[in-house]
Amino acid sequence: MALIDAIQRIPIRGVGISTDVEPDPVWVSDVLRPDYVELIYLQPKVVQAVADQFPGTPFEFHHADIEFYEPAGVTQRFVDAARTVIDILHPHWCNVEMGSMRVGSTLFDQFIFPFLDTDTLTLMADRLRQFQAAVPEVLVTFENPAPLWLCPGGMTLSDYMRQLADATQCGILLDLTHLYSLMQLQHATMNDFAAFPWEYVVQIHVAGSRAFDKILLDDHTAPIQSGVLALLAEVLPKCTNIRGVAYEMDFVSKPIARDMFPQVRRVVESVRPDLQPQAGSTLLFRPNL
């Protein structure tokens, strides 16, 4: 089908990182040696400076959240910001959050996700299609939301993600920490996600988290939970068209990053030794070392 064809046209990226400029990109390059870098949205002049410092580096792009709570939806400002960074990095995909960190002028420290029902599915599909049409040179991917409570709305996450991908022909960024937290909250096993659209997964994110009441909250400064790494080994064989696995490490300390990134790479290499960078990908390097 068209979506799978689009995913398969993307070169395999390998094992990379998703970050901004902290920790220092030079240290990341010299010490961690990721296969690719997914940059979180930064001011264009900062993105340009990073791109200039690392010529030949394969970059991907993690944009902001699509404001499904805001009547304006996908604004021209949102599109223009994405286009500017895409023109600098030349990524193959552009990820957006299926959630919101603001309602009006109120900001939250965690994403507020949509109800899993047909109304929000229709709204999210309209906004994803609108954004994909505005950036046709990349494949837009959307991320499974972080649960702050049991997902309301009547649909399962598996059905919601599959129907949204089918309706938009956009790929999926599978955030394993979000999935692991949902499984803990629902006392679920992988059998409960048999209908998940694994074949549409373009990239997997793994990240640190911290316990809060009965759930895990995203905390990229914390170590990765051992259960998340075990889940990575379990889901990788299911993601038959995956192009990359990235460790989300924005603002993590160097000792934690030095410990965690090799663990992620070891899991990937042991379970999916075929996930090696292909032609069209270039190993991260810094000139004049």
Summary of predicted features, one role per range:
Residues 76-171, 181:
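Active-site acidic/histidine proton-transfer and metal-coordination neighborhood
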Residues 72-73, 110-121, 182-241:
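Gly/Pro-rich active-site loop or hairpin
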Residues 37, 94, 140, 175, ...:
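Conserved, mostly hydrophobic/aromatic
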Residues 28, 51, 150-166, 182-195, ...:
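Distinct, well-ordered alpha-helical segments
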Residues 7-10, 27-32, 45-61, 77-92, ...:
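Acidic (Asp/Glu)-rich catalytic clusters
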Residues 254-288:
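C-terminal helical cap(s) of enzyme catalytic domains, especially alpha/beta-barrels
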Residues 1-35, 40-41:
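Boundary/entry segment of secreted carbohydrate-active catalytic domains
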Residues 21-23, 41-45, 65-67, 98-102, ...:
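Active-site-proximal loop/turn and secondary-structure-junction residues that shape catalytic pockets
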